């Protein structure tokens, strides 16, 4: 079959039905960009798989497509993390469980406060945990809410203002009916 790629860039450390993110499909991937749950100070990421052939292909793609030195068996990229970023991720990984616990505590408080003022938000089901890589809310007047939060010193962002199906590179591939949901 076709391998399923799980994008866990925002959810590294979360779980679904007792299984950790990056472990729910054929290939799991995450980002170590600074704003992510396990972020370094620069850029980086990781791919997880239990399939030996996929793992080998990923290793080759990561080093310009080389299967052995000076032999390029596929098209690849320079996709290696530098040692400083690796050291940062490894150090942060040692306290990652503590950080997740802190995120869960803060997320529960946000949920309580947002419920009190009537915001619509993502409801957390009992068979999964979030690490609150992003905290998404739905409101009638986004600009007014952002302005009020800004005045109170609370940062906000519209993280993906142009939906993927409207991006020029993908517009011809995607379903236009997706847009109303992504804009909600």
Where are the regions a protein language model picked out?
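Short beta-strand-to-turn element immediately C-terminal to the catalytic PLP-Schiff-base lysine
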Residues: 22, 31, 45-51
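Conserved active-site segment immediately N-terminal to the catalytic lysine
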Residues: 6-39, 68-73
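Short aromatic/hydrophobic contact patches that present stacked aromatics
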Residues: 29, 46, 134-136
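PLP-dependent aminotransferase class I/II
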Residues: 15, 50-184
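A short helix->loop->beta-strand "cap" motif at the edges of active sites that frequently abuts
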Residues: 1-2
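Short, hinge-like loop/turn segments at secondary-structure boundaries
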Residues: 20-24, 47, 174-177
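Histidine-centered beta-alpha loop that forms part of the nucleotide-sugar donor binding/catalytic region
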Residues: 9-10, 33, 43, 59-63, ...
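Adenylate-forming
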Residues: 40-44, 89
